[in-house]
């Protein structure tokens, strides 16, 4: 399968809301997340609400490139980030906020390409992310150069999360 990456503005991401919800529902419905479909709506709406208020919102989408004119190309993956202080304890730091790949497109290098594209386009310096504290996720990010710097259980969550840093 071939794919292409496209940089998305916040406005473009908002226009693709329904596609993003469908993608997140597919990806987060299974292991290790096991989120209900409404979780995808909440995730996307929270991300887009924040995106439109940020000057440094950065996002890439991966589309199937099998169609020569890319008309109606399927959304295979998405990544977004911005500079924030939420995970750093007050120091403005670029945060990888969301990385999602459709289950049928996982294992093809799409997630890594999205990840790398975002980090190149994002603010220079170290970056942070927060993800579930499960080997399936932490091992992947460790292979990609991230290190666990904190473990926590935010708010009303029943699951443990890690904060990871990449220099």
Model-derived segments and spans:
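Conserved acetyl-CoA-binding loop-helix of GNAT-fold acetyltransferases
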Residues: 101, 107-120, 142-143
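Active-site rim helix/loop that mediates acceptor-substrate recognition in acyltransferases
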Residues: 34-68
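Conserved catalytic-core motifs of GNAT/GCN5-like acyltransferases
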Residues: 128-130, 142-163
